[in-house]
Design a protein with these regions (language model features):
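Signature for HUH/AEP ssDNA processing cores
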Residues: 2, 10, 49-192, 199-211, ...
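DNA replication initiation modules
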Residues: 137-170, 201-317
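Conserved Walker A/P-loop ATP-binding site and its immediately adjacent core
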Residues: 465-497, 681-683
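Conserved helix-turn-beta segment of the N-terminal RecA-like "Helicase ATP-binding" lobe
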Residues: 487-523, 527
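Conserved helicase ATPase core of P-loop NTP-dependent helicases/translocases
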Residues: 528-531, 687, 697-734
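Post-DEXD/H (motif II) to motif III coupling segment of the RecA-like Helicase ATP-binding lobe
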Residues: 557-558, 565-626
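Conserved SF2 helicase motif VI
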Residues: 591, 755-775, 779
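Conserved interdomain hinge at the start of the Helicase C-terminal
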Residues: 639-680, 687-691
C-alpha cells in the first residue's frame, strides 16, 4: 500500500464519517433510535487487520493525526551540566553568526528570529529517537493561526493528581465511553503520568475543544472524588485563543523513539498495558465530528466548569447550589468536626456529593480570564482557585463554608452532629468605656449572634470602636490581626481609650533588675514581642515563620481581622487556616477585591452579617459632599500608547499640570481648608510638597518608603499641629488608604487617574470623620481628557 493510497483512504474515511454524523443528527432530531458499536479504546471492537507500514507511511499517519501549527514547532533541549530540560521553538538562524547573538539577545527577544517549519525529517527523527538525551523530541503548538485545533489532549500526572494518575485517567475515560467520545490513552514520557487524546475530523475552535474537555472533566469529578481542580489547567490547548504575540502552550508528541523503547510515550489500554502494534492503533483512530461535539455540548448544558462559588457587589458571600445531589448520595447521619477548618468525614458520601462540597470552597480566578481576554499568556495562572483540602478520611473546608454545608445536609434530611474542637479561650475581665451609636448596636446584634462573620462598613462607621465593644461582650482572650504598623498603633491607642482591662500580668525585668512598665495590651511586630495572651495585636507578617503560622495563633478564643480584605493574600490565609478560635470576625470597608479573590475573605471570616453603605452614612453625617472635576490641558504629544506607569510618571513631571494643581491647593488653604493631596508616585509627593511650602504653615509628607522613625515623627508632628495653623498633607495613596485617621481633613486632591472602586472609597473615607466646624468636604478630581487612557479611567470613576 503506497503513500498515495493511504492519503486517499484517509480522505474517504473522513467523508464517510461526516456523512454518518449528519445522518445521526437527523435521527436524533426526530427521536429515532439507532445503535452502533462503541469502539472507544477498541473495546468490543473487531480488531483491525494488522498491516505493515513503511517508514514513509508511518510518518504520514503520524502527521495526519497530530496536526497543529506547521510553520513553527519546538524541540526538547537538555543541559548535561545542570540536568535541566525544556522546549523552545526551532529557529532556522540559530548559531548563524550573521543573525544569532546569544550574548545580546535571549531567543524569545531576538529580532532576527525566523521559525523553522515542521518537516518530514523532524518527524522521522522524533520517531527514531537517536539522541540519547531526547533532544530530537518534538513539541507541537496545538492552536493554529485561526484559533482552531485538530485534537484535545488531557494531561494527568502524579504531581497534579492527589491519589495517583491512573484513577483520574480512568474517571475521565469512563465519561468519554459513556458519552460515545472516542479517546486514546498515552503513557507519558516519564512513565508517571498519561495523556488522553481526542481527535477531530476537521479543525474546530479551540474554545469549543476546551469546553468539551471541561464538560467531560466536570462529570468525571462527580464520579471520582479525588480529581483535582488543577486538571482544568492541564488541557492542550490550554487557551481559547492565541496570546498576543505568542504561540500558546505546546504538547510533546507521543511515540518518542528513545523512551518508546523503554515502554513510555506509547498508547496503552485501560489496564495501562501497551498495545503490541502502535501503528495499527494510530491507523484506525476514530475522530469526532464537529456535529457530534455540538450535540454533546447541547445535551450537557450545565456550566462546563461546574457550579462554583460566585460573588457580586450585592451578595459577595454567595455560594453555589448543590447540583443533582440525591438523598442516596449521603449517609443517614454524619458527624462534622469544627476546628481550624470544618472537617467532613468521607464515609458514606458519594463522589458527586464530595465534589459539590469541594465546589463550595472554589471559585473562578478572575486573573486568568482577564489575561485570556487581553490575549496575554496564562501560563501558571489557574482557572479555578480551591481552598479545600482532601485527606484519606476527611474533606476539610474553610470555617466560613459551614452554613452552606449545613444547608445542603438539612435539605437532604441528613441527621447532623458537630463536634466542636475550637479553642474557647480563657475568660478575661474587660469592660467597654464607650457608648455605641444606634447603627453600631444593630451591627453588634447581628454579629454577636454568630461565631463567625464579616462587618462591611464605611470608614466613618467606627469599626475599631465597635470591635472593642465586641471584645467586652465576648470576654475571651483575643488576638487582633493587622497588616501594617499604623493600624497596630491605632488599635493600641483605641484599646487604651475604650477598653478597661482588669487583668494582672507578670512585668518583665530590665537589665538592672527593675520591673519595666508594661501594658496589658500585647503587641507583636518586627523587633518587639510583648504578647500576654489577654488582648494582643499582631502584625500578620510576624505571625509567620518560614511560611508557617506560629503556634501562638491557636491560643485565643477570639480572633479579629482588621481590613480583612487582605485575607486573600497568601500570608493572611496561611495564618487564618491555622487559627482554632471559636470566634473569628473580619472588619472591612471594601469587601470586593480588585483581583476578585473576595470569596476567600468570607471562607475564612464568615459571610457578611451586617453592611453599612456610604449612602447610609451620608444621611447621618453633618456635612455636605462636593465633587470638583478639574480638566487639565495636558497632552501626550509623543505617544498615546504608554503604559499606566509610564503615563503617571509623565503626568508627575509636567510642570504646567503641577502648577495647575498647586493653584487649587493654595486656594483651599486660603479658605482655611485642610487638604490631603494624593498621588501614586513618591517623587511626585516630594515635588508637590516642595511647591506647597510657601503657602502653608505645615506641609507633611507621608510615603511608604520612609523609615519607621520618619513615619513616627511625621505622625507625631500631625498630632501637635494646632487647629489655628494651616496644614497640607501630601501622601501616596497606598500609605494613606488604610489605618490613617485624621478627622481635620476636609479636602481631597486626586492628582493621578484611578478607577478601582475600593481605592475611591478608601481615599474619600479619609474626609468623612466628624470634626468640629466641618460643614463641607470637597474632592478635586483631575481629568486629563486629552489622553485616551485617562479619559477612559475618568468615565469608570463616574460609574462608581
Amino acid at each position: 500500500m503506497g503513500l498515495t493510497d493511504i492519503t486517499a483512504l484517509t480522505s474517504r474515511i473522513q467523508e464517510l464519517e461526516k456523512e454518518n454524523s449528519r445522518l445521526r443528527a437527523i435521527l436524533d432530531k426526530n427521536g429515532i433510535s439507532y445503535t452502533f458499536k462503541d469502539n472507544n479504546l477498541q473495546e468490543n471492537a473487531v480488531p483491525a487487520p494488522v498491516v505493515t507500514y513503511s517508514l514513509e507511511e508511518k510518518v504520514a499517519i503520524f502527521q495526519g493525526l497530530f496536526q497543529g501549527r506547521s510553520d513553527v514547532f519546538a524541540k526538547r533541549w537538555y543541559s548535561e551540566t545542570s540536568k535541566k530540560s525544556g522546549y523552545q521553538p526551532v529557529c532556522e538562524r540559530e548559531w548563524n553568526p550573521d543573525f544569532c547573538d546569544k550574548r545580546k539577545y535571549k531567543c524569545a527577544d531576538c529580532p532576527n528570529r525566523q521559525f523553522a517549519p515542521l518537516s518530514y525529517s523532524h518527524l522521522f527523527n522524533h520517531l527514531a529517537g537517536k539522541d540519547k538525551w531526547g533532544r530530537d523530541v518534538i513539541g507541537l503548538y496545538p492552536i493554529r493561526k485561526d484559533n482552531t485545533c485538530c485534537f484535545l489532549c488531557a494531561d494527568f500526572d502524579d504531581k497534579s493528581c492527589e491519589h495517583g494518575y491512573k484513577n483520574d485517567v480512568l474517571a475521565f475515560v469512563n465519561v468519554c465511553k459513556a458519552w460515545k467520545v472516542p479517546c486514546y490513552i498515552e503513557r507519558s514520557r516519564s512513565g508517571n503520568g498519561a495523556h488522553v487524546w481526542i481527535f477531530f475530523q476537521t479543525p474546530i475552535p479551540a474554545s469549543k475543544a476546551r469546553k468539551l474537555g471541561n464538560t467531560i472533566l466536570t462529570e468525571a469529578m462527580n464520579k471520582e472524588m479525588r480529581l483535582s481542580f488543577k486538571s482544568y489547567d492541564r488541557f492542550f490547548p490550554n487557551q481559547d485563543t492565541l496570546p498576543e504575540g505568542g504561540l500558546g502552550n505546546l504538547v510533546a508528541l507521543p511515540l518518542q523513539g528513545m523512551v518508546r523503547r523503554q515502554g513510555n510515550s506509547v498508547f496503552v489500554d485501560e489496564h495501562f498495558n501497551a498495545f503490541s502494534n502502535q501503528w495499527n492503533v494510530l491507523a484506525n483512530i476514530q475522530k469526532m465530528s464537529q456535529a457530534d461535539i455540538d450535540l454533546l455540548l447541547q445535551k450537557h448544558i450545565a456550566p462546563s466548569l461546574g457550579n462554583l462559588s460566585t460573588t457580586s457587589d450585592a451578595k459577595p458571600w454567595e455560594t453555589p447550589d448543590a447540583e443533582l445531589i440525591e438523598a442516596s448520595d449521603f449517609p443517614k447521619q454524619i458527624a462534622l468536626t469544627r476546628a481550624n477548618m470544618l472537617y467532613i468525614p468521607l464515609t458514606g458520601l458519594s463522589a458527586r456529593c464530595v465534589n459539590a462540597f469541594k465546589r463550595i470552597a472554589a471559585f473562578r480566578n478572575p486573573e486568568f480570564y482577564e489575561r485570556q481576554g487581553m490575549r496575554l499568556s496564562t501560563y501558571n495562572v489557574p482557572r479555578i482557585i480551591s481552598c479545600s483540602e482532601l485527606s484519606d478520611h476527611y474533606l476539610a473546608l474553610p470555617r466560613g463554608c459551614e452554613d452552606a454545608v449545613s444547608d445542603i445536609l438539612s435539605r437532604h434530611a441528613v441527621n447532623t452532629s458537630i463536634s466542636d474542637k475550637t479553642n474557647h479561650g480563657r475568660s478575661i475581665s474587660v469592660t467597654f468605656k464607650g457608648e455605641l451609636r444606634e447603627e453600631q448596636q444593630m451591627a453588634m446584634d447581628a454579629m454577636i449572634a454568630h461565631r463567625t462573620g464579616t462587618l462591611s462598613a464605611t470608614t466613618a462607621f467606627g469599626k475599631t470602636v465597635f470591635a472593642i465593644a465586641m471584645i467586652a461582650q465576648r470576654k475571651v482572650n483575643t488576638l487582633i490581626l493587622v497588616h501594617n504598623k499604623a493600624l497596630l498603633a491605632q488599635w493600641n491607642e483605641r484599646l487604651e481609650q475604650f477598653l478597661g482591662i482588669d487583668e494582672a500580668i507578670d512585668k518583665p525585668h530590665g537589665n538592672r533588675g527593675r520591673k519595666k512598665d508594661s501594658s496589658t495590651i500585647g503587641c507583636l511586630y518586627s523587633g518587639k514581642n510583648t504578647l500576654h495572651g489577654i488582648i494582643d495585636i499582631a502584625l500578620i507578617q510576624s505571625c509567620l515563620n518560614e511560611g508557617e503560622a506560629k503556634p501562638f495563633v491557636k491560643q485565643y478564643g477570639m480572633v479579629i481581622v482588621d481590613e480583612c480584605h487582605h485575607v486573600s493574600s497568601v500570608s493572611f490565609e496561611q495564618v487564618l487556616r491555622q487559627v482554632t478560635a471559636t470566634y473569628v470576625y473580619g472588619l472591612t470597608a471594601t469587601p470586593i477585591r480588585k483581583d476578585g479573590h473576595q470569596p476567600i475573605i468570607f471562607m475564612q471570616c464568615g459571610k457578611i452579617r451586617f453592611a453599612s453603605k456610604a449612602k447610609d452614612q451620608i444621611v447621618k453625617q453633618t456635612f455636605n459632599r462636593v465633587l470638583v472635576p478639574r480638566f487639565t490641558t495636558y497632552r501626550n504629544i509623543t505617544d498615546d500608547t504608554k503604559t499606566y506607569t509610564q503615563l503617571t510618571q509623565a503626568l508627575s513631571e509636567d510642570s504646567a499640570r503641577n502648577e495647575f494643581i498647586i493653584d487649587d491647593i493654595k486656594s483651599a488653604l486660603e479658605n482655611r481648608r485642610t487638604p490631603l493631596v494624593l498621588t501614586t508616585r513618591t517623587a511626585h509627593v516630594r515635588t508637590l510638597a516642595q511647591m506647597l511650602l510657601p503657602f502653608a504653615d505645615h506641609v507633611v509628607q507621608l510615603v511608604g518608603a520612609d523609615s519607621n522613625k520618619e513615619k513616627r515623627i511625621a505622625l507625631q508632628k500631625l498630632q501637635a499641629i494646632p487647629q489655628t495653623e494651616s496644614l497640607a498633607i501630601v501622601a501616596t495613596g497606598k500609605y494613606i488608604g488604610e489605618g490613617f485617621d485624621y478627622p481635620r481633613l476636609d479636602t481631597l486632591f486626586l492628582t493621578m487617574p484611578i478607577a478601582w472602586k475600593g481605592n475611591i472609597e478608601q481615599y474619600s473615607g479619609r474626609l468623612h470623620r466628624e470634626y468640629d466646624g466641618k460643614s463641607e468636604v470637597q474632592i478635586y478630581d483631575y481629568i486629563d481628557f486629552h489622553v485616551p487612557l485617562c479619559d477612559s479611567i475618568y468615565r469608570k470613576r463616574l460609574k462608581l
